[in-house]
């Protein structure tokens, strides 16, 4: 009797385990920011996109393919040539995500690694096309314009593959050794020219100052000559008195100087 009970319990447990396995295999989860495409072994890729949450499928017949629909960054380095045939090394940073409604087409025509298959090729194509419109110098001075044109063209091109580009930016821009040396030489020449211009301007200012000073001396001499012609010897005597007063004032402030009136003698007691 007990053996039959244990046998029944074992069969029930086995059936329960099998049922649990079947139910578990018929469930799948789609995490936040993700979408799922269903592949059916008999009908192929279904033209539906499954949203977030827990969903049912037919075990061993259907299989979910999960896609991350959140924005992801990718850096694409490209070596190309400018309009004036200078080598340009550019790195483009792209923030991309797939169009959720087009995931079945993306999976069917490109595959799960769509970003690896599409982004490097179209980025190289667009960058070469845009950079070839500008000289090397313009790529530096008009970098914002270049970045905007690359972004517009690349966004339009990526849309044909079912991709959305949230941001496109130039993060790295360098040139060949010859162009870099030419730019450095130009900067040195500009600095030397600026220094020479400063020296010339300084000399001009000094020249003007000397002219102004000479004109002032000439004017002062003219005024003195006119004063002498008008006042005669009286002006000279006045200047002598002013000079004598100034000398007397300076002597009175010194303790080591003795003033001796004229016509008087001073006896000095010398040692015998």
From Swiss-Prot:
- N6-succinyllysine: which positions carry it? 202
Q: Which residues form a coiled coil?
A: 177-211
The record's section on InterPro entries has: Band_7 (IPR001107), Band_7/SPFH_dom_sf (IPR036013), Prohibitin (IPR000163)
In its UniProt entry, what is this protein called? Prohibitin 1
Endpoints of the signal sequence: none
Function as written in the Swiss-Prot or TrEMBL entry: Protein with pleiotropic attributes mediated in a cell-compartment- and tissue-specific manner, which include the plasma membrane-associated cell signaling functions, mitochondrial chaperone, and transcriptional co-regulator of transcription factors in the nucleus. Plays a role in adipose tissue and glucose homeostasis in a sex-specific manner. Contributes to pulmonary vascular remodeling by accelerating proliferation of pulmonary arterial smooth muscle cells.
Where is the PTM N-acetylalanine found along the chain? 2
Query: What is the originating organism of this protein?
Result: Rattus norvegicus (Rat)
Tissue specificity here reads:
Expressed in brain, heart, intestine, kidney, liver, skeletal muscle. Highest levels in heart, liver, kidney and intestine. Also expressed in flagella of epididymal sperm. Expressed in lung tissue and pulmonary artery smooth muscle (at protein level).
Which residues does this entry mark as bearing Phosphotyrosine? Answer: 249
User: Which residues are annotated with the PTM Phosphothreonine?
Assistant: 91
* Subunit comment: The mitochondrial prohibitin complex consists of two subunits (PHB1 and PHB2), assembled into a membrane-associated ring-shaped supercomplex of approximately 1 mDa. Interacts with STOML2. Interacts with MAP1LC3B (membrane-bound form LC3-II); the interaction requires PHB2 and takes place upon Parkin-mediated mitochondrial damage. Interacts with STAT3 (unphosphorylated or phosphorylated at 'Ser-727'). Interacts with CLPB. Interacts with CD86 (via cytoplasmic domain); the interactions increases after priming with CD40.
User: Per the similarity annotation, which family is this?
Assistant: Belongs to the prohibitin family.
List of residues that carry N6-acetyllysine: 128, 186, 202
Principal location: mitochondrion
Query: Where does it live in the cell?
Result: Mitochondrion inner membrane; Nucleus; Cytoplasm; Cell membrane
Q: What is the lineage of its organism?
A: Eukaryota, Metazoa, Chordata, Craniata, Vertebrata
SUPFAM superfamilies attached to this UniProt entry: Band 7/SPFH domain
């Amino acid at each position: 009797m007990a053996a039959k009970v244990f046998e029944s319990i074992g069969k029930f447990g086995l059936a329960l385990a099998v049922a649990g396995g079947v139910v578990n295999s018929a469930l799948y989860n789609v995490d936040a920011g993700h979408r799922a495409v269903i592949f059916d072994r008999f009908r192929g890729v279904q033209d539906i996109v499954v949203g977030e949450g827990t969903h049912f499928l037919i075990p061993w017949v259907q299989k979910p393919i999960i896609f991350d629909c959140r924005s992801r960054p990718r850096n694409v380095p490209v070596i190309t040539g400018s309009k004036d045939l200078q080598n340009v090394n550019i790195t483009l940073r792209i923030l991309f995500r797939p169009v959720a409604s087009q995931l079945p087409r993306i999976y069917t025509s490109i595959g799960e690694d769509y970003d690896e298959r599409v982004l490097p090729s179209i980025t190289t194509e667009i960058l070469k096309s845009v950079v070839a419109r500008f000289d090397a110098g313009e790529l530096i001075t008009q970098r914002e314009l270049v970045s905007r044109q690359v972004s517009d063209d690349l966004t339009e091109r990526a849309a044909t593959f079912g991709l959305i580009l949230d941001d496109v930016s130039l993060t790295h821009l360098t040139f060949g050794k010859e162009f870099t040396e030419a730019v450095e030489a130009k900067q040195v020449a500009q600095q030397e020219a600026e220094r020479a211009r400063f020296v010339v301007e300084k000399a001009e200012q000094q020249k003007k100052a000397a002219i102004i000073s000479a004109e002032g001396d000439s004017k002062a001499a003219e005024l003195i000559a006119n004063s002498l012609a008008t006042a005669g010897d009286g002006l000279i005597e006045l200047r002598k008195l002013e000079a004598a007063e100034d000398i007397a004032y300076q002597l009175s402030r010194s303790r080591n100087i003795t003033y001796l009136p004229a016509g008087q003698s001073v006896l000095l007691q010398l040692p015998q």
